[in-house]
């Protein structure tokens, strides 16, 4: 029997890719809604009542209002996966980054309220948590995270901005150091203070790279690039969607020596590169992913699969 799914916000950037993925999933059936009724609450409540799972791909405030109405009508029995940032640090919601730690998949399976991570947060936490969990860096460390994302991460307005005419190769934003992903990075990174987060948007549609540069001076004594790489290798060795390149590998670079943020488009994978200069005592960790894949709709499908006992990779990849 197919799992009945309703996507609220299926016409948005994340919603469209989520729908594309779910159409390829052999275990689900999508509940449709007429375009002229998609903002009609009473009509949506009828669709919610039919659904085993509700995906929310809405702006934050709309998501909060919709969850309120679902709770009022159905209590906590309906399974919700929220792709917005509205509930990412709320009590009663489980954080939908399955690779966060060894217990996270169980937490996702055992709840009816799953909040999908932000795309930047996914990359940042994949780099930070192994270091914190193994006491390599202190929870009070001042971290500096740099990142670049394709412009689809900014939704329809940014897509229109970059699509209409030639634009700069990339642009910095969130210059007041208040990006909305910071709270979840700090909370789930187990950090005592916000990192300095410097995001930018590139003149390409999809793909992203999140990087964490560190000095060995900030770490416990006797650390080296090889030891850090071994920690990451052990942490992610059983994770299907996280790959780790060999230490200081040139194979992940283009022939010109560049590291492209666009290698995983259409997938739910996250790739980690570690570059270490033990002589200078510096290390650079870089996570790459598709901002609309592992950073959004792919992760949402993965969380659905975990929740309902399907194979974890079913429907997570878009066909080219």
Predicted features along the sequence, with ranges:
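N-terminal Rossmann-like NAD(P) cofactor-binding subdomain of oxidoreductases
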Residues: 2-167, 173-174, 275-278, 314, ...
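C-terminal substrate-binding/catalytic lobe of Rossmann-fold NAD(P)-dependent oxidoreductases
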Residues: 11-45, 57, 141-147, 151-285
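Predominant activation on well-ordered alpha-helical scaffold segments within soluble catalytic domains
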Residues: 19, 68, 125-132, 182-186, ...
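Residue-level signal for pocket-adjacent positions within structured domains
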Residues: 90-95, 103, 168, 196-199, ...
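Secondary-structure boundary/capping motif
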Residues: 123, 220, 224, 295-296
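C-terminal helical cap and adjacent loop that interface with cofactors, partners, or active-site loops
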Residues: 237, 261-320
């Amino acid at each position: 029997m197919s799992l009945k799914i309703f996507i609220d916000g299926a016409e948005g950037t994340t919603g469209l890719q989520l729908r594309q993925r779910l159409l390829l999933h052999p275990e689900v059936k999508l509940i449709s809604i007429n375009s002229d009724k998609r903002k009609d609450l009473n009509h949506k409540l009828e669709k919610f009542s039919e659904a085993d799972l509700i995906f929310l791909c809405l702006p934050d405030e709309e998501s909060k209002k919709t969850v309120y109405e679902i709770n009022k009508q159905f209590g906590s029995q309906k399974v919700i996966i929220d792709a917005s940032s509205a509930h990412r640090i709320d009590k009663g919601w489980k954080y939908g980054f399955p690779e966060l730690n060894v217990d996270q998949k169980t937490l996702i399976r055992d709840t009816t309220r799953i909040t999908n991570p932000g795309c930047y947060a996914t990359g940042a936490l994949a780099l930070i948590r192994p270091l914190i969990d193994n006491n390599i860096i202190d929870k009070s460390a001042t971290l500096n995270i740099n990142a670049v994302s394709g412009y689809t991460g900014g939704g329809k307005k940014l897509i229109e901005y970059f699509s209409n005419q030639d634009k700069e190769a990339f642009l910095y934003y969130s210059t007041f150091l208040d990006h909305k992903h910071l709270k979840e990075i700090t909370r789930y990174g187990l950090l005592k203070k916000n990192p300095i987060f410097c995001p930018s948007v590139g003149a390409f549609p999809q793909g992203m790279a999140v990087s964490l540069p560190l000095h060995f001076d900030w770490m416990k004594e006797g650390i080296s690039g090889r030891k850090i790489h071994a920690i990451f290798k052990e942490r992610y060795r059983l994770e299907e969607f996280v790959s780790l390149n060999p230490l200081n590998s040139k194979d992940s670079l283009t022939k010109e020596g560049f590291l492209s943020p666009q290698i995983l488009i259409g997938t739910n994978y996250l790739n980690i590169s570690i570059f270490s200069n033990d002589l200078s005592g510096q290390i650079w960790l870089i996570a790459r992913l598709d901002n609309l894949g592992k950073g959004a709709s792919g992760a949402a499908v993965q969380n659905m699969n975990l929740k309902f006992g399907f194979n974890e990779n079913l429907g997570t990849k878009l066909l080219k």
